[in-house]
């Protein structure tokens, strides 16, 4: 039951973060230890992170590795605790292309259909985009 409370708080953070066009993400604390990054380079996805006593949970890893690194930097400005989980809400690139930056994360969590999509035709298209990242 306690876990559901945190899921609700994370979803609230996602609600308050929007899709926007800007240069640098802005970190906003929307609740105690719950942060959202608004704005970013190019098409921006919602990115939220929660700092618990054990570590950090990140929701959606951004549209590029460069943007994902900005998320990591924002986390490190708040805490040095380990990043335990990265959650992908769905398979679109603006929510998953930053996964590679979080490869040292304990676990990347997503619905099984996200994995199926990334392993199927959508994943082949994603792989071509991944190859273009430096």
What are these regions (language model features)?
Residues 7-17:
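Bacterial N-terminal signal peptides
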